[in-house]
Amino acid sequence: MAASRRVVVTGMGIISPLGNELETTWQNILAGKSGAKTVTAFDVTEYPTKFAAPVENFDDVNHLDVKTKRRVDEFVQYGLVASKHAIENSGLELNSIDSSRIGVSIGSGIGGLDTIEKNALTLNKRGPRKISPFFVPGAIAVSYTHLTLPTIRLV
């Protein structure tokens, strides 16, 4: 049997329809607010559901470089920024901690659909050579763990 280990959550970060940082999101939850809104980004006349819960006012300026933004789907960018917020929220000096004792836990329902759709259209119109080699890693949820760990010097 493996030795039991304690897990301590030291920092949290969130990008959500209720806010793009922890305190705002928490206050909106306590206030009973909903992140759902009528869809205005496209015509929903033919759709049975006319609402969604989009992330709004996402500010990545101080968190992501241009190359990362170009290579990964916006939902992966949410995960990267939320991870950075969690690290900041922890208050830990990461350079002074054994990296084998640090982990990042990330949750997401679904994402990358914009990137998948754009690449499917590109494939059909222009052929496979026009698909970016960053298509799959830029569209899947595990991308943010892969991209976050070097940022916080864990690998």
Please describe what each predicted stretch is.
Residues 145-151:
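Conserved small/polar residues in nucleotide/adenosyl-binding loops
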Residues 1-68:
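ACP-dependent fatty acid/polyketide chain-elongation machinery
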Residues 85-131:
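Hydrophobic alpha-helical hairpins/lids featuring a short glycine-rich hinge
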Residues 14-23, 66-81, 128-140:
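Active-site pocket-shaping loop/turn-to-helix segments
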Residues 2-4, 8, 72-85:
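N-terminal amphipathic, basic-rich helices that act as targeting or association modules
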Residues 6-8, 102-103, 134:
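Structural motif
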